Amino acid sequence: MRLALGIRYNGQAYEGWQSQRSGRTVQDKLEAALAKFAAQPIGTLCAGRTDAGVHALMQVVHFDTTVEREPFSWMRGTNRFLPDDIAVQWAQPVPDEFHCRASALARRYLYVLSQSPVRPSLDSGRVGWSMHPLDGDAMRAAAALLVGKHDFSSFRASACQARSPVKDLRRIEITRVGSGDRCRWHFEFEADAFLHHMIRNLMGCLVRIGRGDERPEWITEVLEARSRKVAAPTFSANGLYFLGPLYDAKWGLPAEATLQAGGAPYDGPP
């Protein structure tokens, strides 16, 4: 039997998703909890491998098992053995042809940025920070130049293992929440797939433009250079959330994971 799970986690305490020798990763904690509940080893695959400090609203994983339980039991039983900052949101049997990564039609991320003269305290680790006021119109103008199918080599980490730097960036929405010198900015990204550190590198450039350090058209120069050296430094992981992959409704997953329903809504820090 193949089972899919929707996972939500706060990534502050972890060295990313992927299993490490230290055992301090989300995958390590999840597989340990699944093994305790199922009384057998279970290996998982995920839709998107998040980096250290990155959060997830709807990570999707799948695994194969001979253990037969009701979906609700998988959710409740696994959560019993998980730490408080990781929780299974749903469990769903899927056909053997389903693959959480290969079957995804799109992926969505959100960056939450606090604009304030004072660094975040209560939301430390859950939002990024800019002490400088940002120009939303300038950032949106730059974002519009990024949308489409491009070679994103300038926004790719040196350790990126993707076969191709060409990705279809389908949407960037930038929304201001609040007014004055203390507000939040939400940057939502949707693409067929993302390169390693791609969003954090895009954020570094967008914030530089928002501060007025570069004009919006500069982003095109960075894109066309296809060189990491010309882009802004990689932005903090603190405010980055994996909103989740989107699948065809034929797989029978919950609405928050289907393309037709638009995916999971963000309900983190306002």
Swiss-Prot record:
Main function: Formation of pseudouridine at positions 38, 39 and 40 in the anticodon stem and loop of transfer RNAs.
Active site: D51
Pfam families cross-referenced by the UniProt entry: PseudoU_synth_1
Catalytic class of the enzyme: isomerase
Catalyzed reactions per annotation: uridine(38/39/40) in tRNA = pseudouridine(38/39/40) in tRNA
MF annotations from Gene Ontology: RNA binding; tRNA pseudouridine(38-40) synthase activity
Quaternary structure annotation from Swiss-Prot or TrEMBL: Homodimer.
CDD domains, per database record: PseudoU_synth_EcTruA
Protein name: tRNA pseudouridine synthase A
UniProt-annotated binding residues for substrate: Y109
InterPro entries cross-referenced by the UniProt entry: PsdUridine_synth_cat_dom_sf, PsdUridine_synth_TruA, PsdUridine_synth_TruA_a/b_dom, PsdUridine_synth_TruA_C, TruA/RsuA/RluB/E/F_N
Domain of life (superkingdom): Bacteria
GO biological process, alphabetically ordered: tRNA pseudouridine synthesis
Gene it is expressed from: truA
Record's keyword terms, sorted: Isomerase, tRNA processing
Disulfide bonds: none
The protein's Enzyme Commission number: 5.4.99.12
